[in-house]
């Protein structure tokens, strides 16, 4: 009996002991459990991946909505600014028109005042000149009568209408 024979017998006995103690079934059971655990982990990873993709899609949709809302807000703000500018421009033009109208009224009033002053001065000068001429040419009684007549309201209103 050779060494090879005894090595073969030892191998057969070892394998028989393994079968007797059900080691191959235990190894198979352990490998099956590990394969099941790995399969469960892969299923969980796929489920988590799908959930992550759903969340990503939802956030991308929300981001797109937020962009759209931001663009709408910007457009509304631009429209509001344009409205405010147009209103301010209209008010400024109206203010300038009112100021010009007021200035024209003040100028017209100043012209009227100047005309009245010149008319009044001209009347006073005419009266003074008439008084001096009358005093030289007429006696004092007749001069006073003519001055009183000239200063009457009727004659003053006639003079004003002629001067205007």
Curated annotation (Swiss-Prot):
Pfam families: ATP-synt_B. Keywords: ATP synthesis, Cell inner membrane, Cell membrane, CF(0), Hydrogen ion transport, Ion transport, Membrane, Transmembrane, Transmembrane helix, Transport. Its main location: membrane. It is a single-pass membrane protein. Disulfide bonds: none annotated. It comes from the Bacteria. The chain crosses the membrane at residues 4-24. Coiled coil: none annotated. GO terms for cellular component: plasma membrane; proton-transporting ATP synthase complex. It is found in: Cell inner membrane. One of its GO terms (molecular function) is proton-transporting ATPase activity, rotational mechanism. PANTHER family: ATP SYNTHASE SUBUNIT B (PTHR33445:SF1), ATP SYNTHASE SUBUNIT B', CHLOROPLASTIC (PTHR33445). F-type ATPases have 2 components, F(1) - the catalytic core - and F(0) - the membrane proton channel. F(1) has five subunits: alpha(3), beta(3), gamma(1), delta(1), epsilon(1). F(0) has three main subunits: a(1), b(2) and c(10-14). The alpha and beta chains form an alternating ring which encloses part of the gamma chain. F(1) is attached to F(0) by a central stalk formed by the gamma and epsilon chains, while a peripheral stalk is formed by the delta and b chains. Belongs to the ATPase B chain family. F(1)F(0) ATP synthase produces ATP from ADP in the presence of a proton or sodium gradient. F-type ATPases consist of two structural domains, F(1) containing the extramembraneous catalytic core and F(0) containing the membrane proton channel, linked together by a central stalk and a peripheral stalk. During catalysis, ATP synthesis in the catalytic domain of F(1) is coupled via a rotary mechanism of the central stalk subunits to proton translocation. This is ATP synthase subunit b 2. It comes from Bartonella tribocorum (strain CIP 105476 / IBS 506).
